[in-house]
């Protein structure tokens, strides 16, 4: 590890292979917590490259719990977090809208690191069992159409690092790679990131991971979601080509809304917002979910255009299908799935 730390101190990039080996060291028991913290801080100060991100993703996926990966066509819409905006749980709420529209959603997530309420905190508050095993997740994807993959369960080697990340209380490379380490063999992906200069590198990693189609977004105000506040910077991966775009919410019929107006709170407050949105209540929260779910449906290939994606997202909510998916997940995730274990 000393060689890698020395390179980072000198501002040098690590190669993909060096980062892969460093990643295996980070996940081992043969390293001091102070070394892990130093590595994360130095890497953040230098700035992460696509090669470094992919190298660490390789290490994490290698050490993750094994999946059969017989489920075809799955999607994740997990974002990086780390934007400091304290918004409600946009991507987690949107996940049920996607599922209600017929997308198989393998939602990867964690507890809060730099926000008040992470996806795991919200789902637990709503009554979802967040500790499903790989076999149970396969079952849920096949029979319910949505499953939650709790990062500490999927990546047991990350437990030490999670503690250090919490103590550092700043975004690190683990924010960036969270959405990229889903152990399910995803076909498509919608990724919100908090760093605009990482749009292309993250898209390049998704390309290396073999995604059929993907959309990476950095929202107005550097949100890790699409925002109603103004122009959103987007990179589309389609047909193995990467294209930069911008998305203006007003073009799709939305009024501009400041990011401060979609702030969330603790898990109880955010659960209330999620239930209101999925129940069809009109609000700025709903509009934010419609924009994000609409973009994700376009990224999935479920619709040909973003406009159609937004309409399909609205139908998923207003038909009751999105809320039904939540209720089905609550029930099925809490069953004793002995038949699949």
UniProtKB/Swiss-Prot annotation:
Catalytic reaction annotation: N-(5-phospho-beta-D-ribosyl)anthranilate + diphosphate = 5-phospho-alpha-D-ribose 1-diphosphate + anthranilate
Q: Does the keyword Lyase apply?
A: no
Q: What is this protein called?
A: Anthranilate phosphoribosyltransferase
Instruction: Give one GO biological process term.
Output: L-tryptophan biosynthetic process
Q: What class of enzyme is it?
A: transferase
Originating organism: Bacillus cereus (strain B4264)
Keywords per UniProt:
Amino-acid biosynthesis, Aromatic amino acid biosynthesis, Glycosyltransferase, Magnesium, Metal-binding, Transferase, Tryptophan biosynthesis
The record's comment on protein family reads: Belongs to the anthranilate phosphoribosyltransferase family.
Known function:
Catalyzes the transfer of the phosphoribosyl group of 5-phosphorylribose-1-pyrophosphate (PRPP) to anthranilate to yield N-(5'-phosphoribosyl)-anthranilate (PRA).
* E.C. designation(s): 2.4.2.18
Gene Ontology cellular component terms for the protein in this record: cytosol
Q: List ligand-binding residues for Mg(2+) 2.
A: 224-225
One GO MF term attached to the UniProt entry: magnesium ion binding
């Amino acid at each position: 590890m000393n060689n890698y730390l020395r390179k980072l101190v000198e501002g040098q990039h690590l190669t993909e292979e060096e980062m892969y080996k460093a990643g295996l060291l980070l996940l081992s028991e043969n390293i001091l917590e102070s070394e892990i913290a130093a590595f994360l801080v130095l890497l953040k100060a230098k700035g992460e490259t696509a090669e470094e991100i992919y190298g660490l993703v390789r290490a994490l996926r290698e050490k993750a719990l094994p999946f059969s990966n017989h489920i075809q066509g799955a999607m994740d819409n997990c974002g990086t977090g780390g934007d400091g905006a304290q918004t409600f749980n946009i991507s987690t709420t949107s996940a049920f809208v996607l599922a209600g529209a017929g997308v198989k959603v393998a939602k990867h997530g964690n507890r809060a690191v730099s926000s008040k309420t992470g996806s795991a905190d919200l789902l637990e508050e709503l009554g979802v069992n967040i500790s499903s095993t790989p076999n149970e997740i396969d079952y849920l994807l096949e029979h319910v159409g949505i499953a939650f993959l709790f990062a500490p369960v999927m990546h047991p080697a990350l437990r030490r690092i999670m503690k250090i990340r919490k103590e550092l209380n700043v975004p690190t490379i683990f924010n960036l790679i969270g959405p990229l380490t889903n152990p399910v063999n995803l076909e498509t992906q919608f990724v919100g990131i908090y760093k605009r200069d990482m749009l292309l590198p993250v898209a390049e990693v998704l390309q290396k991971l073999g995604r059929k189609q993907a959309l990476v977004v950095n929202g107005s105000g550097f949100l890790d979601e699409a925002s109603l506040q103004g122009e959103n910077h987007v990179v589309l991966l389609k047909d193995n080509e990467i294209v930069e775009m911008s998305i203006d919410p007003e073009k799709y019929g939305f009024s501009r809304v400041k990011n401060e107006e979609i702030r969330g709170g603790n898990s109880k407050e955010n659960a209330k917002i999620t239930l209101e949105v999925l129940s069809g209540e009109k609000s700025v929260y709903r509009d934010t979910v419609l924009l994000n779910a609409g973009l994700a449906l376009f990224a999935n290939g479920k619709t040909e255009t973003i406009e159609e994606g937004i309409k399909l997202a609205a139908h998923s909510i207003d038909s009751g299908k999105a809320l039904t998916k939540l209720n089905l997940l609550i029930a099925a995730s809490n069953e004793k799935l002995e038949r699949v274990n």
